[in-house]
Amino acid sequence: MKLRILVGVLLLVCSVAAGAADRKYIVKPRAGDMKALPFSDGVLVGNTLYIAGHIGLDSKTGMPPASAEDEAGLVMEGIKQTVESAGLSMDDVVSIQIFCTDLKLYDTFNGVYKTYFHGDYPARAFVGASTLLRGGRYEVMGIAIKRAP
C-alpha cells in the first residue's frame, strides 16, 4: 500500500515537473515605457499557445491611430507576430475574444479580421467594453493549438 502511494506521488511530481519545463514564454520587443510590462505576449505550453490581450498602438506615438480600421490592423498584426513567434500560424488559432469600446465598429473590425484567416474561422466573442488601455478601441486575446504535422 505504501509503495503504491509512493509511486503515485512520484508520478505526480514527475508529470508536474515535465509540464513546467514544457513552457515557452513569447515576449516581443517593446519600446519606451512598454519594456517593463509584467506579462508575456503569449505562453506556449505543449502545443497550446495562450495569447495575451493585444492592443493596436502606433509604434511612434504609443497611442492608437486615428483610424479604427488601422487600429484593428495593428491589433491583428500583433496577434499574428505572437502566434508566429511561437512557431504556429493564424490557421492554428482556435479561439479569439475581442473587447471593443464601440459595438458600432463590429463591421469595421470584421473587415480587417477576416483577412488573417484562410478557410474556417476560430470560435469568437465580440464583447463591449467601456474603456481600454491607452484609449484603444480594441483588445484581442486568444488561444492557438498547433496542428499535428
Please tell me what each predicted stretch does.
Residues 1-2:
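N-terminal secretory signal peptides that target proteins for export/translocation
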Residues 5-10, 18-77, 81-94, 99-149:
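N-terminal presequence-like segments and the immediate start of the first folded domain
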